[in-house]
Amino acid sequence: MLGWIGDIEKATLDNDTFRTVVYTAGHTQLTVMRLRAGEEIGWEAHGHLDQFLRIEEGTAEVDLGRGEDAVDETHPLQDDWAIIVPAGIWHNVRNTGDGDLKLYSLYSPPEHPDGTVHATKAEADAAEAAEHGH
């Protein structure tokens, strides 16, 4: 296939992993994510890429900050809401609902190795620590 074509809503809602890379192109990557009640992505910044996230199911909050040590803004999120996080902006998405939060993310350029599947946040954290030597 010359690109990815599919029902992104179905792919997102059917996902039962913390993070799965669905497709990686030369300049963009599509991932689907599930955060359990109370779970969060974690405070992070991507210095080299922009990130788009869209909520398909659930409620959440996003924190945004100019630096690692300060949250400058917090915004509520719900179904069909989206976030664009520019390169270098610190951010965290937190599931504030009682059920799963289902979302998808576009990274430009790609962030994760093609084919990445992290069943849980703990698995994702361990992989990141190994990759970055923490």
For each predicted feature, which ranges?
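Short hydrophobic/aromatic-rich beta-strand segments that constitute the beta-sheet cores
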Residues: V32, V62-L64, L103
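Histidine-centered metal-chelating micro-motifs
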Residues: E40-G42, E61, W81-I83, A87-V93
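Short acidic-glycine-tyrosine-enriched beta hairpin
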Residues: G67-A87
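A short, N-terminal "cap"/entry segment at the start of jelly-roll beta-barrel domains
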Residues: M1-V32, G42, T74-Q78, A119-H134
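Glycine- and acidic-residue-biased ligand/ion/polar-headgroup-sensing regions
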Residues: H48-E61, G65-G67
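A generic "binding-loop/recognition-motif" signal
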Residues: T28, A37, H48, I89-W90, ...
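Ligand-binding loop in jelly-roll beta-barrel domains
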Residues: Q78-D79, A87-P113
